[in-house]
């Protein structure tokens, strides 16, 4: 039985030791390579120095660094805060460049108009006749019609010449005005005469219609986005990426590639994503696509507007002008021709669509065709809409599509275009009114890099590549392979180390300064390897933040005059303080846990989920953070509570430690609390005596005894107290008195002291007896329960004593063995030394015997 008890005792000891050693605590790591999706404002940088872009963006320092990461991330070009932000920002740049700024409320009057159809001209007749033919006309730089401005097929718009009366500078007199309008911009009613109609402007009552203050140029501008310090940009580096990929290899970059701000429908111009291949970004839920065209085919577009234009101002009311243009044969017209191998480029687009995993239509290339929208659509959808040097061109692409698709009918590699003043906004619903085209020749050249289209197929027989007017799709292609993330350098993980326990120092590694991007260089490493470099990581993070802050401050200082009144200037200044706020927020959070300025901070908080533990050798910090993100709120609360309790304990400890210093005993401020307490006790005793005196006096008054109102000698009257109630020893009469030693005299005030003492004594006796009875009853009740609990401690004491006796016996045996071995060794050594010492004597004795 004793052996069983010993085994049980040893088992309990091992279990308790294992339970203590196997317990994990929350450890806070600062500087881990982890992140989460973000949607903060970005700021832009550009190389332009001579355009309006310099007042919108900061100067570009050409710092484009890229680091490959061995991890995966989900990307979606359409569910992307960066592309949405780019759409809004480009619209802001667009509005800043050619923004209408004067409300156009006049001209909401009845106008008498004469319809002047331009189809009666010779050119239009020739053009109409040519529409019925199927000839092919191709232009190049050497074509004579380009130099003479006589290329056939430039259609003429239907124009209406109108007259109206409005009050001018003299409010009591009306003035007659003349103006020329496009037919589609007016709503007309039949007049009294056959050639006369009553017309109104369609959009005269729309409050958002405005007139431009001044004529501006819309120059080509390229800029790139930059992430504020504390944030990073991830780019999908997979050639199979098509706008959506849940697992994509990626890299970390400090800022985006250059992005083009060109706005247009149908085609994208001067894009930065053109490669030596054709690829498609396809929306994850519908048929919206943006197709990047192969740069091998050198697809370009050249637009030209003939000169000799005249703009006439019309003063409608005092201080407000409306600019008009006299009617002529070709009002507000231009034309664009296309160069490059368009036929093979569109053929490659069809092949790419056929091989795309999202496509399930016909595989016959001849049944996949490039189509346009119906004629009832908006002008920006029905025509190719683009901006050329600040003018809005609407180009009829019918001849061009016939040429590319090799259809029947007139085939031309150029399109006729018209310049409009009333333009539908592409970012929001509304219209703007701009000045008429400037005088002189207008031309612009662009590289065609993408095609905006909806791919529709109903069955396996026909597929339409319908060109689209979604301008925002251009920025899905430009920036759809990026995503913005916020660096989350604070992480939690369970370790067996508790706060204030000794830790084996780690070998320090050399710090390689990689800049801010080097912070994420270990994102693909295992947690154990990444945690070894947390000191370097956190220093790199702070150094990168400070460096980027300094660079941003420098460029803002250089541009502060230009940035004073711009919206983008405000955004750039806002980005300056984003990172430092984030860093201070992280440090404040670490400070609330008692981990300020520590890379690895062990705590006393037990790990909340023992079944969830990291694989330090195979798991990255990003993977671990995804698993424990739902525990962050609980862990944060526990850490804050533990830190509050720790601060309370430290405060109490400091209060006790202050008496360790001998000089503190003579500090008057240290004794003030005790002096105050002593005064309170004295005052309490005095008040208690007064209260007892009053109570005693009232009690005596109720009995009819009133010593208070007696004469002063009554205060000293004696109260006889018998010493012995038996018969007095001396027989004396009552008159003669007796032995004075048999009585004691007490002042009556003493009884006031005896009364509270007796009451206090009775109260203490009652409390003592009650507590003793309660403890006795409790002990008797718990006796059966405590009896089994005495055995384990008894076994433990027995085991400890047995273990001590065994150790003592082993020590005695070892001591005796060592002593015996020492005595034996000493004897052997002594005999050996004696023999060695006797050698000379033996030699001498031998020599003497030999001589004898």
From Swiss-Prot:
PTM notes: Specific enzymatic cleavages in vivo yield mature proteins. Envelope glycoproteins are synthesized as an inactive precursor that is heavily N-glycosylated and processed likely by host cell furin in the Golgi to yield the mature SU and TM proteins. The cleavage site between SU and TM requires the minimal sequence [KR]-X-[KR]-R.
Keywords: AIDS, Apoptosis, Clathrin-mediated endocytosis of virus by host, Cleavage on pair of basic residues, Coiled coil, Disulfide bond, Fusion of virus membrane with host endosomal membrane, Fusion of virus membrane with host membrane, Glycoprotein, Host cell membrane, Host endosome, Host membrane, Host-virus interaction, Inhibition of host innate immune response by virus, Inhibition of host tetherin by virus, Lipoprotein, Membrane, Palmitate, Signal, Transmembrane, Transmembrane helix, Viral attachment to host cell, Viral envelope protein, Viral immunoevasion, Viral penetration into host cytoplasm, Virion, Virus endocytosis by host, Virus entry into host cell
Side Extracellular, residues: 25-677
Annotated TM spans: 678-698
Stretches assigned to the Cytoplasmic side: 699-852
Paired cysteines (S-S): 44-57, 101-213, 108-204, 113-162, 236-248, 303-336, 388-444, 395-417
Residues with site note (Cleavage): 509-510
V5 as annotated region, ranges: 461-467
Residues covered by region (Immunosuppression): 573-589
Motif (YXXV motif) on chain: 705-708
Region listing for V4, in residue ranges: 395-417
Region (V1): 113-161
Top-rank taxon: Viruses
Region: Fusion peptide, residue numbers: 510-530
Residues bearing attached sugar chains per UniProt: 37, 70, 114, 148, 195, 205, 237, 247, 270, 276, 287, 298, 341, 364, 396, 406, 445, 461, 464, 609, 618, 634
GO terms of biological process kind: clathrin-dependent endocytosis of virus by host cell; fusion of virus membrane with host endosome membrane; symbiont-mediated suppression of host innate immune response; symbiont-mediated-mediated suppression of host tetherin activity; virion attachment to host cell
Annotated region (Disordered), positions in chain: 713-740
Motif mapping: Di-leucine internalization motif: 851-852
Region (V2): 162-204
Signal peptide residues on this chain, from the entry's feature table: 1-24
InterPro entries, per database record: Gp120_core_sf (IPR036377), GP41-like (IPR000328), HIV1_Gp120 (IPR000777)
Pfam families: GP120, GP41
Note: Some HIV-2 isolates have been described that can infect cells independently of CD4, using CXCR4 as primary receptor. These isolates may have an exposed coreceptor binding site.
Biological role: The surface protein gp120 (SU) attaches the virus to the host lymphoid cell by binding to the primary receptor CD4. This interaction induces a structural rearrangement creating a high affinity binding site for a chemokine coreceptor like CXCR4 and/or CCR5. This peculiar 2 stage receptor-interaction strategy allows gp120 to maintain the highly conserved coreceptor-binding site in a cryptic conformation, protected from neutralizing antibodies. Since CD4 also displays a binding site for the disulfide-isomerase P4HB/PDI, a P4HB/PDI-CD4-CXCR4-gp120 complex may form. The surface protein gp120 is a ligand for CD209/DC-SIGN and CLEC4M/DC-SIGNR, which are respectively found on dendritic cells (DCs), and on endothelial cells of liver sinusoids and lymph node sinuses. These interactions allow capture of viral particles at mucosal surfaces by these cells and subsequent transmission to permissive cells. DCs are professional antigen presenting cells, critical for host immunity by inducing specific immune responses against a broad variety of pathogens.
Protein's UniProt name: Envelope glycoprotein gp160
Protein's organism: Human immunodeficiency virus type 2 subtype B (isolate EHO)
């Amino acid at each position: 039985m004793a052996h069983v008890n010993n085994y049980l005792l040893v088992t309990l000891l091992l279990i308790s030791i294992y339970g203590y050693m196997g317990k994990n605590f929350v450890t806070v790591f600062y500087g881990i390579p982890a992140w989460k999706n973000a949607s903060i404002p970005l700021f832009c940088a550009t190389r332009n120095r001579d355009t309006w872009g310099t007042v919108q963006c900061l100067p570009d320092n050409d710092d484009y660094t890229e680091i490959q990461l061995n991890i995966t991330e989900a990307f979606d070009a359409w569910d992307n805060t960066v592309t949405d932000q780019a759409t809004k920002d480009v619209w802001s740049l667009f509005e800043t460049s050619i923004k209408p700024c004067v409300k156009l409320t006049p001209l909401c009057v009845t106008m008498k108009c004469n319809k002047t159809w331009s189809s009666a001209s010779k050119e239009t007749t020739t053009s109409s006749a040519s529409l019925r033919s199927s000839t092919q006309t191709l232009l190049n730089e050497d074509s004579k019609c380009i130099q003479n401005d006589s290329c056939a097929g430039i259609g003429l718009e239907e124009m209406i010449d109108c007259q109206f009366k409005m009050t001018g500078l003299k409010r009591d007199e009306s003035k007659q005005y003349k103006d020329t309008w496009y037919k589609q911009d007016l709503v007309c009613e039949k007049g009294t005469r056959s050639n006369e109609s009553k017309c109104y402007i369609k959009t005269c009552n729309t409050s958002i219609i405005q007139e431009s203050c001044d004529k501006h140029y819309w120059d080509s501008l390229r800029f790139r986005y930059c992430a504020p310090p504390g944030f990073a940009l991830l780019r999908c580096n997979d050639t199979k990426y098509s706008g959506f990929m849940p697992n994509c290899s990626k890299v970390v970059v400090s800022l985006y590639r250059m992005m083009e701000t060109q706005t247009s429908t149908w085609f994208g111009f001067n894009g930065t994503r053109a490669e030596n291949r054709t690829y498609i970004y396809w929306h994850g839920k519908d048929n919206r696509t943006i197709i990047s065209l192969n740069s091998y085919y050198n697809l370009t577009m050249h637009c030209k507007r003939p000169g000799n234009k005249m703009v006439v101002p019309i003063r409608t009311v005092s201080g407000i002008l409306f600019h008009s243009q006299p009617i002529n044969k070709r009002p507000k017209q231009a034309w664009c021709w296309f160069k490059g191998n368009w036929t093979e480029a569109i053929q490659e687009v069809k092949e790419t669509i056929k091989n795309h995993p999202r496509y399930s239509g016909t595989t016959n290339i001849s049944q996949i065709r490039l189509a346009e929208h119906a004629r009832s659509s908006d002008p920006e959808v029905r025509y190719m809409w683009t901006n050329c040097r600040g003018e809005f061109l609407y180009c009829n692409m019918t001849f061009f599509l016939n040429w590319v698709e090799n259809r029947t009918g007139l085939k031309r590699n150029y399109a006729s275009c018209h310049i409009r003043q009333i333009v539908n906004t592409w970012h929001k619903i509304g219209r703007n009114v701009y000045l008429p085209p400037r005088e002189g020749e207008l031309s612009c050249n662009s590289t065609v890099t993408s095609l905006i289209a909806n791919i529709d197929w109903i069955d396996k027989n026909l597929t339409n590549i319908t060109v689209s007017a979604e301008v925002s799709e251009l920025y899905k292609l430009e920036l759809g392979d990026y995503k913005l993330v916020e660096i989350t350098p604070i992480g939690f993980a369970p370790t067996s180390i508790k706060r204030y326990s000794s830790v084996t120092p780690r070998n320090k590694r050399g710090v390689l300064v990689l800049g801010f991007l080097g912070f994420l260089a270990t994102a693909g490493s295992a947690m154990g390897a990444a945690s070894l470099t947390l000191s370097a990581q956190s220093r790199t993070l702070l150094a990168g933040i400070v460096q980027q802050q300094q660079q941003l401050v420098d460029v803002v200082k250089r541009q502060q005059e230009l940035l004073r009144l711009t919206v983008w200037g405000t955004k750039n200044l806002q980005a300056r303080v984003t990172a430092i706020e984030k860093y201070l927020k992280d440090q404040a959070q670490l400070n609330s846990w008692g981990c300020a300025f520590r890379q690895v901070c062990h705590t006393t908080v037990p790990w909340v989920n023992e079944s969830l533990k990291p694989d330090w050798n195979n798991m990255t910090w990003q993977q671990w953070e995804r698993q424990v993100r739902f525990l962050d709120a609980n862990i944060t609360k526990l850490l804050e509570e533990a830190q509050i309790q720790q601060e309370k304990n430290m405060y109490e400890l400091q209060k006790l430690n202050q008496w360790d210093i001998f000089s503190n005993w003579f500090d008057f401020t240290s004794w003030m609390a005790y002096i105050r307490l002593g005064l309170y006790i004295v005052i309490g005793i005095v008040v208690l005596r007064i209260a007892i005196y009053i109570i005693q006096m009232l009690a005596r008054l109720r009995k009819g005894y009133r010593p208070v109102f007696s004469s002063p000698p009554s205060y000293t009257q004696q109260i006889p107290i018998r010493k012995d109630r038996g018969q007095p020893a001396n027989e004396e009469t009552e008159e003669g008195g007796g032995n004075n030693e048999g009585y004691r005299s007490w002042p009556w005030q003493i009884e006031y002291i005896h009364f509270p003492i007796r009451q206090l004594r009775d109260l203490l006796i009652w409390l003592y007896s009650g507590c003793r009875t309660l403890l006795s009853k409790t002990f008797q009740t718990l006796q059966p329960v405590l009896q089994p609990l005495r055995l384990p401690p008894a076994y433990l004491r027995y085991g400890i004593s047995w273990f001590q006796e065994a150790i003592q016996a082993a020590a005695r045996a070892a001591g005796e063995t060592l002593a015996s071995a020492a005595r034996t060794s000493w004897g052997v050594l002594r005999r050996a030394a004696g023999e060695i010492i006797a050698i000379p004597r033996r030699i001498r004795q031998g020599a003497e015997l030999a001589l004898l």
